[in-house]
Amino acid sequence: MQQNQEITKKEQYNLNKLQKRLRRNVGQAIADFNMIEEGDRIMVCLSGGKDSYTMLEILRNLQQSAPVKFSLVAVNLDQKQPGFPEHILPEYLEQQGVEYKIVEENTYGIVKDKIPEGKTTCSLCSRLRRGILYRTATELGATKIALGHHRDDILQTLFLNMFYGGKMKGMPPKLMSDDGKHIVIRPLAYCREKDIERFAQAREYPIIPCNLCGSQPNLQRQVIGDMLRDWDKRYPGRIETMFSAMQNVVPSHLSDVELFDFKGIQHGSEVVAGGDLAFDREDIPMQPAGWQPEEDDSQLDEMRLNIVEVK
């Protein structure tokens, strides 16, 4: 009995540290990109997955101590997939005292009617879902739309575009929507997926599976995700450094003539970003730049096992 109590205390200690880390990361992203302003009404897109649950809880937590006042409204799109547990989110949100709206649209039927059997449905489904969420944001008077993409999603998107799209394009923490009417924010932009996964498991959120539509998995994204997870295990700090690189772009040392005026370089031009080192190799640090191991990672890794043992 005493051993179980000690494990429970350790779990709570680790959970508190994890929550503080997520709060810190979300708060920093909000500050860096001016995501939330005085009087904002944030539409939090809630899918029933670990990311959106975590985003909602951290935003509610920050709301209590934020220097600006803002409101939150959770929105879920019920696309009428067979077997969708439509009672889960309303019950959870009412229990938490969160303002919410469930939007019911049979996009599943439209997609099944338009897309031949065996073909991936993700593209059409995504367009339909996006349009409905934009419309809902307008109806609710939302000034910002919050999505639950995290740091790993952003890096995956960067590599997907590099490997398959031939462009260096990631997923922005904040940007105007494609219809030009809404500001989309990603408060989890600085958060690690493994932190979110641990937090969601400890919180025991009522997770809704994401495979209800029966669509084919995005194999390209899966390959990229596996690659990044492998790197994270084999080369600690690499993921953090790659994300830092997205925040430290040097256009003069790339090849995009739209970003830098290569044609305008003449004798007497200013030396930019250290200039060209010619035959000298770039001075690369032995350890990933700016990376420091999280002191409590090993303890957090034990948290999942501890929770299982207590139960």
Swiss-Prot record:
CDD domains: TtcA-like (cd24138). Keywords: 4Fe-4S, ATP-binding, Cytoplasm, Iron, Iron-sulfur, Magnesium, Metal-binding, Nucleotide-binding, RNA-binding, Transferase, tRNA processing, tRNA-binding. Pathway: tRNA modification. It is found in: Cytoplasm. Its EC number is 2.8.1.-. Pfam families: ATP_bind_3. A motif (PP-loop motif) lies at residues 47-52. GO terms for molecular function: 4 iron, 4 sulfur cluster binding; ATP binding; magnesium ion binding; sulfurtransferase activity; tRNA binding. It catalyses: cytidine(32) in tRNA + S-sulfanyl-L-cysteinyl-[cysteine desulfurase] + AH2 + ATP = 2-thiocytidine(32) in tRNA + L-cysteinyl-[cysteine desulfurase] + A + AMP + diphosphate + H(+). Its cofactor is Mg(2+); [4Fe-4S] cluster. It comes from the Bacteria. Binds 1 [4Fe-4S] cluster per subunit. The cluster is chelated by three Cys residues, the fourth Fe has a free coordination site that may bind a sulfur atom transferred from the persulfide of IscS. [4Fe-4S] cluster binds at residues 122, 125, 213. One of its GO terms (biological process) is tRNA thio-modification. One of its GO terms (cellular component) is cytoplasm. Belongs to the TtcA family. The thiolation reaction likely consists of two steps: a first activation step by ATP to form an adenylated intermediate of the target base of tRNA, and a second nucleophilic substitution step of the sulfur (S) atom supplied by the hydrosulfide attached to the Fe-S cluster. Homodimer. Catalyzes the ATP-dependent 2-thiolation of cytidine in position 32 of tRNA, to form 2-thiocytidine (s(2)C32). The sulfur atoms are provided by the cysteine/cysteine desulfurase (IscS) system. This is tRNA-cytidine(32) 2-sulfurtransferase. It comes from Enterobacter sp. (strain 638).
